[in-house]
């Protein structure tokens, strides 16, 4: 375990990569998540911080994705079951829609699952599945976003790239409808 700057219990020793834990944002606790993205960020920040502890880590969500048989599966943070196992009062919304407007020459379905904390509506995790590359959408929980934040957040709209309400907006709106806030 290190501090937020990568220092071990000896302030002259910095630790990065698969040798250490990282602050896991969904649970606000240290967790062992051996991913290359974490190792690269930790190593870079440790190199910077050796010269004066100036840049804390932002934590991680355990975001990953894979392409299988022409489909993208992406995930970040907690699944619903992992949230319950962690003792979090959570719920989820499952939402499916096209990623582009129907009038476009081609479109494809995106299935989204958003896991959220019931009281605060904070997004704890998400999973996405589509033929369309949805891998970067899994980064939506880094900033402690809530269903309310994501329901109407400004997203790029141009019919080639998406709908007036992005699939993330629509999934968050579905979650708010599920709990009677929309």
How should these model regions be labeled?
Residues 21, 29-34, 48-77, 150-158:
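Active-site-proximal substrate-binding core of FAD-dependent oxidoreductases
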Residues 71-76, 86-182:
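Flexible, glycine-rich terminal cap/loop adjacent to redox cofactors
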Residues 46-53, 174, 178:
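C-terminal alpha-helix
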Residues 5-6, 65, 104:
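Short secondary-structure boundary/capping segments
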Residues 1-45, 137-143:
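FAD-site-proximal beta/loop scaffold in flavoenzymes
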Residues 8, 41-42, 59-61, 109:
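Short gly/pro-enriched beta-turn/loop segments at secondary-structure junctions
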